[in-house]
Amino acid sequence: GQAPCICDKGPSGPCKICGEDPCICKKRKKLRIKLRDGKEREIQHMISTSFWSADGKPISAEEFLQNLFGTLPEFFKNEEELRTIWSNPVTRKVLLDKLSEAGYGKDELSTLQKMINAENSDLFDVLEYVSYAATPVSREARVLSARENIFDGLNQKQHEFIDFVLSRYIETGVSELDQEKLPKLLELKYSSINDAARILGGAEIIKQTFIAFQKFLYSRRAA
């Protein structure tokens, strides 16, 4: 009953961004790291973050970034090849598996995603930023830009399913577009795979539709 209020607000819990309680986001330092292409990349300095070299030794974030920058050309020659690989769930999985074997697994890439303030973006944006200093695009903006091309040619039922998949992608990330996730997505939307097959025209059409739309999601026009 007093003004200003003196009520105990209780613990606020750790910050969703920095993971600290109280939040230390404003205290974070930004590091500018010049890579071998002569361009700078900006990352957040996160004291609690540890990176490791291929031989298991602790390294700095700068060393990690330099090493990743030097390694990525082994997997794709240019931005267009990265885009082509990433736009197909089969080749994307192969790339992610190879990166993981080289010491750049999803955990490391997700940490780097936080450090470049791209948590609402795609892992594609992380690789593109490191390789070509391209500005990350939010998943929502990517979807909005590509919607017209994605839905062109789909019937109403297919439109509804892909719209559902895209909503999951915006909420969670690129892992929702993995082929392994397709059965779960169908069950979430239609309760059973049999019902999904009946509504959407069969297993093969579902698979083709799920793979085909991703090409438009990652096309240059959508970036």
Q: Can you annotate each of these PLM segments?
A:
Residues 8-223:
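Catalytic cores and motor modules of nucleic-acid processing enzymes
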